[in-house]
């Protein structure tokens, strides 16, 4: 059951799509405070949720802020990252969920100030509070997801492997990447283009020197099974003669200063204006700009810098230059030098600059900081709504860096500028179920790490987790070590692990689609699947993938294995990636086990009475188009037989709910397999 309590006059974030809900006179569980709420926690209570954030699956013990922030240092001391996800579940003496529908800053003190107190602070008393009661953790998530609407569904090819780099500078570099993947029998479906494909970092342009025949090049790549995925940034360059800029100024589509003039900030192209994503007309206009690339054969995009990031605001920059002039005439001692460096550092993403510009919304003029968390959401919404108008029957890939709840209906996310640190493998694992709770099913990290220099063993281990993420993308920063998998010594292991991803695609796609269509979770903490197991509640480095699989990736350098907790008897599946993905299986009892895992191996675990549908002929697969989703082999741990609801569709259109897409597969105790649809063949 969901209950609602309204405080003040909330801004309509359009995060909620559910129908009328009973209004609460008094709120259960939470104690009302002057600026928010509190909850007295027992020692065994666990806090789940908050989407993409640092630290563990259990959020207890730290303070988090819902404040979309451009911060590439994902360390334990941070309180906010790129998104705002105000949904949390308390599990313990009471079990309930709550969602705070508010577009500004919300602080979740999860036992940081007082170990036994959850304290939620909302910047203003204008918000909606939803309390969700359910029979289980999964039921609470299900009800919440129905409240906020169906998760985004990408095209099937978007579940393939993507290779990215800041930046592949021209057509020949992209061709080289594709050729090396193909020569080394490594499947690939997409090459991602970073900012240098543009003409001087201007949105919706292509550099004619580097990509002189972009439409022809996109067609050339598509003929090889490769989709180009260009970046779109959140700001428009100030430049006379640039059509997007000219149209935006003429029609008043940009965010403004208090006096009504366009607000000027600086990012990649220098001085820019921010499109007013909360103005419905401006949002529709910005979304329509994607057509220039759709018309050239592009079928996927990624939205970046949409917190929005600010390198500098023009007025602050002027004051800084003036102060630097004064400092240039001084002898800088420790105090003045500290003031000087601090002043320059505070140019970027300064909180006061977010109070200087305004939006024209359906509810009137709003200062940006009061609706800050909606910017990235509505940028991706602009694209999603435009795709509905321009390509109503076709799925287009779109994922974003910044997000808040509501955006999950329009696109996915990647988890931002991580680093080539072993701790960030574990961080990526922690983020997966928390994002799933909030509706963001299509998500994934930068495999191998974006910042810093990676190592071969780190990339291999990261793929050991990444092949189970819906978004599988290797991405790295300019100036760091190149980390395309074919550049490393153990090419056979990389080829095998990527081929394994494609062998698993029938299961991964089926579980993703069922989670999206039924408002469920593709990835969940062990406690959600095994609610009666007290130890499963404590496990922070294992998760369930779909209904059948438990994964426990290795995330420490030089480790040749790890301890794993199994809540029940399971089938251990060991895949020898360097040996054409040879599979070894053995049954393990419930409990704790040390599991050896060599660098060229992937090990996962399968529940008893479950089936795992796999594709065939991994070595022949170059892209998702080569995967036959209708000719399957089954891996089973089913001594008494088992059944599985398998989902498959054309992967391109949007008629997801057709009954014929759901296939009932059974396996009897003698190993005989059959499906109830003639269109799908299975063998045990």
Which residues does each PLM region occupy?
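Catalytic and substrate-binding clefts that recognize carbohydrates or anionic sugar/phosphate headgroups
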Residues: 1-155, 165-166, 171, 178-183, ...
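Glycine-rich, histidine-containing beta strand-loop boundary motifs that form or position
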Residues: 41, 50, 91, 99-102, ...
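Short, hydrophobic/amphipathic alpha-helical packing segments
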Residues: 64-68, 81-84, 175, 283, ...
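Extracellular structured ligand-interaction cores
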Residues: 82-86, 93-95, 103, 126, ...
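Short acidic-glycine loop/turn motifs at beta-strand connectors
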Residues: 89-94, 257-259, 567-568
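N-terminal small/glycine-rich loop or linker at the start of catalytic domains
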Residues: 150-164, 261-274
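Aromatic- and carboxylate-enriched substrate-binding clefts and catalytic-loop regions
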Residues: 187-494, 529-530
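Catalytic core of carbohydrate-active enzymes
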Residues: 374-375, 380-396, 402-413, 428-431, ...
């Amino acid at each position: 059951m969901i209950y609602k309590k309204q405080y003040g006059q909330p801004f309509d974030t359009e995060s909620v799509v559910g129908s009328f809900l009973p209004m609460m006179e008094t709120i259960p569980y939470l104690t009302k405070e002057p600026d928010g709420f509190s909850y007295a926690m027992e020692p065994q209570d666990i806090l789940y949720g908050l989407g993409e954030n640092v630290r563990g699956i259990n959020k207890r013990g730290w303070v988090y802020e819902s404040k979309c922030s451009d911060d590439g240092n994902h360390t334990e001391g941070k309180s906010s990252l790129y998104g705002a996800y105000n949904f949390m579940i308390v599990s313990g003496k009471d079990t309930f969920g709550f969602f705070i529908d508010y577009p500004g800053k919300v602080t979740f003190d999860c036992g940081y100030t007082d170990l036994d107190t959850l304290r939620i602070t909302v910047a203003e008393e204008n918000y909606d509070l939803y309390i969700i009661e359910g029979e289980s953790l999964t039921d609470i998530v299900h009800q919440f997801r129905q409240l906020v609407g169906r998760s985004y569904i990408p095209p099937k090819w978007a579940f393939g492997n993507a290779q990215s780099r800041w930046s592949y500078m021209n057509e020949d570099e992209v061709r080289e990447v594709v050729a090396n993947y193909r020569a080394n029998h490594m499947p690939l479906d997409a090459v991602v283009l970073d900012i240098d494909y543009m003409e001087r970092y201007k949105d919706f342009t292509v550099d004619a020197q580097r990509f002189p025949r972009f439409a022809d090049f996109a067609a050339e790549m598509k003929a090889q099974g490769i989709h180009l995925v260009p970046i779109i940034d959140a700001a428009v360059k100030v430049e006379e003669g640039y059509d997007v800029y000219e149209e935006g100024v003429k029609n008043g589509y940009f965010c403004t200063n208090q006096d009504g003039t366009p607000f000027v900030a600086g990012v990649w192209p220098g001085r820019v204006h921010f499109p007013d994503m909360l103005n419905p007309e401006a949002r529709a206009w910005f979304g329509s700009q994607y057509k220039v690339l759709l018309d050239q054969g592009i079928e996927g995009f990624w939205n970046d810098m949409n917190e929005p990031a600010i390198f500098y605001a023009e007025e602050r920059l002027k004051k800084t230059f003036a102060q630097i002039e004064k400092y240039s005439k001084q002898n800088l001692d420790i105090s003045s030098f500290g003031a000087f460096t601090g002043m320059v550092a505070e140019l970027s993403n300064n909180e006061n600059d977010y109070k200087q510009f305004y939006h024209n919304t359906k509810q009137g003029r709003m200062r940006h900081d009061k609706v800050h968390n909606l910017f990235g959401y509505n940028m991706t919404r602009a694209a999603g709504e435009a795709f509905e108008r321009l390509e109503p029957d076709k799925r287009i890939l779109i994922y974003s860096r910044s997000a808040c709840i509501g955006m999950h209906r329009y696109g996915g996310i990647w988890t931002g500028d991580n680093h080539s640190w072993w701790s960030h493998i574990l961080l990526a694992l922690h983020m997966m179920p928390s994002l799933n709770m909030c509706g963001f099913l299509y998500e994934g990290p930068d495999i191998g790490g974006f910042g810093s220099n990676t190592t071969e063993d780190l990339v291999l281990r990261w793929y050991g987790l990444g092949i189970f993420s819906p978004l599988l993308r290797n991405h790295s920063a300019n100036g760091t070590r190149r980390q395309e998998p074919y550049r490393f010594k153990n090419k056979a292991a990389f080829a095998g692990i990527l081929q394994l991803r494609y062998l698993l695609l029938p299961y991964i796609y089926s579980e993703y689609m069922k989670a999206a269509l039924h408002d469920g979770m593709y990835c969940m903490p062990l406690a959600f699947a095994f609610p009666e197991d007290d130890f499963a509640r404590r496990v922070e480095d294992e998760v369930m993938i779909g209904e059948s699989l438990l994964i426990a990736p290795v995330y420490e350098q030089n480790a040749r294995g790890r301890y794993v907790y199994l809540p029940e008897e399971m089938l251990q599946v060991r895949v020898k990636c360097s040996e054409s993905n040879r599979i070894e299986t053995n049954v393990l009892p419930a409990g704790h086990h040390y599991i050896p895992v060599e660098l060229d191996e992937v090990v996962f675990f399968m529940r008893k009475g479950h089936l795992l549908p796999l594709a065939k002929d991994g070595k022949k697969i170059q892209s998702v188009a080569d995967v036959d989703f209708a000719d399957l082999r089954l891996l089973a741990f089913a001594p008494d037989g088992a059944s599985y609801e398998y989902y498959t569709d054309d992967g391109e259109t949007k008629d997801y709910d057709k009954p014929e897409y759901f296939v009932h597969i059974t396996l009897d105790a003698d190993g005989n397999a059959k499906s109830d649809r003639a269109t799908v063949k299975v063998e045990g």
